[in-house]
Amino acid sequence: VEKLTPETSGMETTLFSFMADSSKKFSYKKRTEISYNTNSSIGYFSKLSGSALYLNAMDKHFEKTLPVFLDGFLNPTFKQDEYENTMNSLRQRIQGIFNDPESFLAYTISNELYKGHPYEAKTFATPDSIKNITIENLKNYHKELLANGNFSVVVSGKINSDFLIKKLNSTIGKLKFSNEETTRKNVQPISIQKNAPVTLRHSSAEGTAYITKVFASPANTEPDFIPCVLAGNIYTDILFNVVREHYGICYSPQSYVIGSKAPYGIEHLFKVSDFSNFEKTMKEARNYMANDKIVEKTNADGSYEFSTVEQNLEGYKNSYINQTYQSQQTSAGLVSILGYNLIQFNDIDYDLKQLEQIKQTTAQEILRVFKKYWVENPSAWFAITGENTTLNFGEQEQ
């Protein structure tokens, strides 16, 4: 459940890192020894809608590794030296955002688009929130997590179910939960309006530019989301063949929609070298997609070879399915997807519904959503470049 605020950004991620790396009953040396001898690992991931702690172990070692996993979840230790090492890593990550032009651009875009929105909070520590990530606050956050009982246990593999149930009952089963009902935040979509381009300056972007065009896109629970994902994959190939291969505008272009409750879509150019014509060539590529023309290649005489969305649709569907669902072939991958389903959708089988929608998506749906979101929706430009570079954003420039 979305609990983070801008002031507590990074708190949950930091807590879960301690839960993955420490526990009361098992020293660091003992945990490392068990991990090495059993070829197992404990990790975590954090989203704005929730976090997950996971154990990856062979079935035959489950009875040896589960106690380590549960003790980390229930009894993480917050030793001062480990805390200081963690905080140093957080400070380095924050500095890394500002040192890298592309990361700083993405950070700025997120801050601008989510100002005053629940997603103004971040899963990672920020310059404004890091001072709040104290040992005391981490302990309190952990207590709240256990008291609310707002978590689920997901298991996959050929394991001894009697042992699992007995172990869970003797640990998590002894927790006393509060009667307070936890509700999910009502996360509203964001609105993006056409405005003057935002251009940042960075010494490491001297002689090049990173340019992003953003627009509002559908939430990952809406019917238009899957067609938009496929549209982005197809359009990325058109951008590559037009913007990079034909005109040599940049090193790499791409387009995609973010999967969340309040997302936005992106057209991004990585390492731009032509500062005057990038907008014009992007518009050309956009027009081809809107008119159902996939650019396959550029001929020797400079002309294009085209195909249609319908002609290529099955290939794009299969590619997306393989990239997204191939991890289900392992128990660890399956648990990861099931956990994500619960965190993001509160529905453990949601990926199966999306898989069916992928199979049913038509070329007409893809073209419709592309025109609606990429072409007709208002968009905003953001860029980062060197101190003296002038970027031509075309007709949108004010």
Model-derived features with residue positions:
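Short Ser/Thr-interspersed hydrophobic loop/turn segments at strand-loop and sheet-helix junctions
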Residues: Y235-L239
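M16 family metallopeptidases and their MPP-like homologs
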Residues: V1-N75, T86-Q95, P101-D128, N148-S156, ...
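Short, charged, amphipathic alpha-helices and their helix-cap/turn boundaries
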Residues: I130-T134
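An aromatic/glycine/proline-enriched structural segment found at the starts
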Residues: K115, S152-A219, A383-Q398
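Extracellular/periplasmic catalytic domains that process cell-envelope and extracellular macromolecules
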Residues: L145-N148, S204-E206, Y373-E376
